[in-house]
Amino acid sequence: MVMFSQDHVQIVYGSTRICKSLAPANKRKTHRTIVVAPRRGFLRIPPDGQDVNHVKIVPTTSSSLAPPRDDERRPTPPLRPPLTVYPYGTSLIRRSARDAKLRSKLIVFHITRPALGQHPQNPGISGPAAMDHSEFLTSFRREVDRQTVLTAESAPATAEVCLGDALPGGVMGGGGLPAGVGSASAAVAAAAAAVAGVPVAANPVMPATATVTTPPMIDLTSHHRPLTLFTPASAAAAPAVATNGGNATYILPADCRYAPLFASKYKYVFEEVSRLMRLHDSTAVQLQISASCGNAFQALKSALLKLHNVTVLAGQQLITQTMPHTPQAVATFKFFHQDPNRVLDCIRPVVPRSTSYHETGVYQMWVSGATKKDLFDAVTLCASIVEKQPDVFNINVSLLTYPSIAAPHLPLYNEFTSFRLPTS
């Protein structure tokens, strides 16, 4: 299913779906094209992660389109540009520098009729339709950017953070917040101060210099400031409060108590990762994912590469020539390895004699995180994707004998390790 607006495009036909292919990469058919026909002179192709590789745009015909509305009953010029194939996921506005050269080609497609400027065959037409092509593109991009900003600003905020640096220790103000959130924040601050043993003023006033920051975050470099995470007033359960004697107070959000559905399905994976990270450092724990489908593996890899502070090593599994061991070799190996003190006695030079190797059709990926939280986020993302195709993926957790961490992750690792959770 492809999500397109019915006002702008009509799906003509699409090729069959590509799924679970174990063929070699050079013989696997991955090219899936969907053919669309625009309706109003331009076509928006939103990136929505569908299983489509290319989009083919064809000229509109009377048979492929529904009857036009009254405002669209105009004579269409006999312009039929050639068929063009564009990569699926190309949107009207691309912010990447590598697509700057293609922007003029991928924004507006004049297929149904010339919607801009003068008519190529009737130069006498003028008026609002005689707008310059570049001027129209500029105004169109500006309008799309403005709608994007308005959509981002109108999204409801799930939580707010109030930093009260100018207030005495333990006093939290509720000024600058909405009426509902202000009353809830005052009650939460009073509960936190009561637990910390700090007196609370009767009517705390927020100074003019106080700021409200969204989204909530804890500054690991200076976490001794009083910081409160406010939850919606409709939260059923009271938030958990942690304090270390009044120096810092952290109130956990109430929605962190409810795990998604896939957490119960892969409970053993989360529990094993948590157990290993309690016993060992995060640099010694690594996540291993195997997949039997190349397309699903690439989708998981693309999703993981959008996470922060992770390292990913991915590739296809190779198998060498299979050769059984002789009974004498098996007996010798087991005899020397029964006693740990005789392990070095059985070491002999190894001569590689395999004459062939080939791909097994299994794809493997190793994921490491800069901190324990980053590794746990990677496990959570993998579980949410693996849940959709459980017969394709396999998750494994490995413990390394020697710590492994990328050099750019060392500052973040040191800050995360030096942070101490306040004791209640």
Curated annotation (Swiss-Prot):
GO cellular component annotations of the record: host cell nucleus
Record bears the keyword Transport: no
Region (Disordered): 57-82
UniProt keyword terms in alphabetical order: Host nucleus
Domain of life: Viruses
GO BP term (any one): regulation of DNA-templated transcription
Coiled-coil portions: none
Name of one Pfam family that matches: Herpes_IE2_3
Family: Belongs to the herpesviridae U84 family.
Biological function: Plays a role in the inhibition of host DNA replication in the infected cell. Targets the mini-chromosome maintenance (MCM) complex and blocks the accumulation of MCM proteins and their loading onto host chromatin.
Protein's recorded name: Protein UL117
Organism: Human cytomegalovirus (strain AD169) (HHV-5)
Top-level taxonomy: Viruses, Duplodnaviria, Heunggongvirae, Peploviricota, Herviviricetes
Gene: UL117
